[in-house]
Amino acid sequence: MMLAQKQNFMNQFYKKYHYSIQKYQITDLLFFLFLYPFSTSYGNEQFSFDSRFLPSGYNYSLNSNLPPEGEYLVDIYINKIKKESAIIPFYIKGNKLVPCLSKEKLSSLGININNNDNAECAETSKAGISNISFEFSSLRLFIAVPKNLLSEIDKISSKDIDNGIHALFFNYQVNTRLANNKNRYDYISVSPNINYFSWRLRNRFEFNQNNDKKTWERNYTYLEKSFYDKKLNLIVGESYTSSNVYNNYSFTGISVSTDTDMYTPSEIDYTPEIHGVADSDSQIIVRQGNTIIINESVPAGPFSFPITNLMYTGGQLNVEITDIYGNKKQYTVSNSSLPVMRKAGLMVYNFISGKLTKKNSEDGDFFAQGDINYGTHYNSTLFGGYQFSKNYFNLSTGIGTDLGFSGAWLLNVSRSNFKDKNGYNINLQQNTQLRPFNAGVNFDYIYRKKGYVELSGIGWHGNLYNQLKNSFSLSLSKSLDKYGNFSLDYNKIKYWDNAYDSNSMSIRYFFKFMRAMITTNYSLNKYQSYEKKDKRFSINISLPLTKDYGHISSNYSFSNANTGTATSSVGVNGSFFNDARLNWNIQQNRTTRNNGYTDNTSYIATSYASPYGVFTGSYSGSNKYSSQFYSALGGIVLHSDGVAFTQKAGDTSALVRIDNISDIKIGNTPGVYTGYNGFALIPHLQPFKKNTILINDKGIPDDIALANIKKQVIPSRGAIVKVKFDAKKGNNILFKLTTKDGKTPPLGAIAHEKNGKQINTGIVDDDGMLYMSGLSGAGIINVTWNGKVCSFPFSEKDISSKQLSVVNKQCNRPENSGD
């Protein structure tokens, strides 16, 4: 290759992969050593090695075919499935390099060792681990583990939870709407919040101004704390009830409830159990499609297997029983679920005590509420609850069960007593996923005896006017594969006084034609208060125009009703920048009524997501009116390292810091870049789950080197976790070193340069080439090997080039260093 081509190849290869090397403080030159022989002596057979082969702390020249002991960054595979990359200590045993795996490390990999082996390096062979092999050429560690030693790898312990930083932070939203240049409406929302250890204080205040009328109110104030080991969440103050049995209400008091986010999906989500009878010693194989998720031997008699395998994704299971004579029996297990259903043996509860807010109770009456869900065996969940307040009591009980091919069914019966009124409520639900037909069926039926009063109704003294009698809803969905999707929804509601009875039906068909996405919809609505049925047909067409520069789409919609009103709209919308932080929309609407009146409306809107907030503006107008709207949404975080102006913080978020370096893209949220002081807020994380914080390396300037572009955090609920990425700002340079006697420092010699608190390191290759990154200004680089040392200076002139260039330097030994 030509020299320019070689250097360009090295540059691109280095920029793509050097972050993972720096993560473990292994110099960038290690990476270059693998690449450089190909770029300078292409086609020659010379010694080279993968940069990751060198363990941390390795500081002598290489002169052996046997890999040295030390710590290596390796990819770990459990039963041929990659689990993680980690630094593992290795030592020489016999004539090979073997890993040092502690009991704690094995546990973090999901491997259970049930002995008292607390040594630094556990005796894996005695623990039952069948085979461990290390593939040195690719730095892959393979561990073969019997199934009985495997636990759920995604399970998280309390010591893994990050409660985040102490912080005072504010979320704000400011809206202004101006109609016809005279009528003005202003809205301001401010949420001052405090995080202290695992305690969360949450507040929200709102200000409204409609022309001259002004109101200011507090929405809520509450204190919250999570207890991970107990899997519960505590709230004291003003909040909302949360229940699978009852509707939700606002209250002031105390709530203790199971936090389902603290469980992994396989711990809490319902999955079926496989039951059967083996006539003799038999092999049981359970498949989902072509994937085997259970392969076990059982003795003669009844058997039962809970489906806990992480490979199970729901749907039909095929069970095969093979006895000792080779005879086979096969049957199919279908399953469906409902939100109330839980894993067998798991209990989920919620208990609340306090006062109802006045909008639910005229006098703010005291009330108490509790509900429990318990997953039983035989694919069922039992649930029930109670509510009581002044002159009011409600008791509810129910069951959700999976009946196989006919789907999941729920039956819930509640009875209420309020003063002289009493009644009951019956709810029957069904959900069936007919996966062989790519179809789903759901219905929900409620019957309510007159006299039944919900808790929210006691504020109206149990007024039975306009009380629900029954309701029925049915939903059908069918995938037509390449021909699109079809769905039908039907709803019927009836009241005891017939005042607000209604029927509605909607038929929807979605399909693609070439690049266009087309949705058609027909709806029919009948209301008791209107004699005429409302019939509507609509069609919506969306056509992507480009995806090369931004994302631009055109859209057209048309709607026609039997009332004589027809509406059409045509427009174009899109986004700019790779993360779609700038969005825009232009629409032209036309409405024609049966009296001949026609209204034309124009609409234009744009929004921009910046590191400091999201800003929106829009304008709409016709020949009779105009409207302008402006909005700003953001946050301010005060913490031990200063102040960060950010986008609005979600319930759980991460504050990312890259040492005073701005404009670095973090994650996928539009507009999330590091600000002027190097801070950025990732607004939405999943509590008690593994969240990956990823830096977009495409936008990193050439003069910035990051030790790592990916980190993982497990935040508690409401936490703001701080994630710091170490960065070096400076140029990258390749030195060609010679000593005073014309020789070169040996392969493996260590170079280091100190710039304040930052230490830059590198390793010399077998041609005396030294790659250094993050160099700025002028300084001295020291090179050491086998107790010997030499040094050389560099200047701004040496590192001024933006391209990777080779600079010749003589490395001189101090007089007292010896030979």
From Swiss-Prot:
GO terms for molecular function: fimbrial usher porin activity. One of its GO terms (biological process) is pilus assembly. Keywords: Cell outer membrane, Fimbrium biogenesis, Membrane, Signal, Transmembrane, Transmembrane beta strand, Transport. It is found in: Cell outer membrane. It is a multi-pass membrane protein. InterPro entries: Fimb_usher, FimD_plug_dom, PapC-like_C, PapC-like_C_sf, PapC_N, PapC_N_sf. Its main location: membrane. Gene3D superfamilies: 2.60.40.2070, 2.60.40.3110, 3.10.20.410, Outer membrane usher protein FimD, plug domain (2.60.40.2610). One of its GO terms (cellular component) is cell outer membrane. It comes from the Bacteria. It holds the Pfam family PapC_N. Belongs to the fimbrial export usher family. Involved in the export and assembly of C6 fimbrial subunits across the outer membrane. PANTHER family: FIMBRIAL USHER DOMAIN-CONTAINING PROTEIN YDET-RELATED, OUTER MEMBRANE USHER PROTEIN. This is Outer membrane usher protein CssD. It comes from Escherichia coli. The lineage of its organism: Bacteria, Pseudomonadati, Pseudomonadota, Gammaproteobacteria, Enterobacterales.
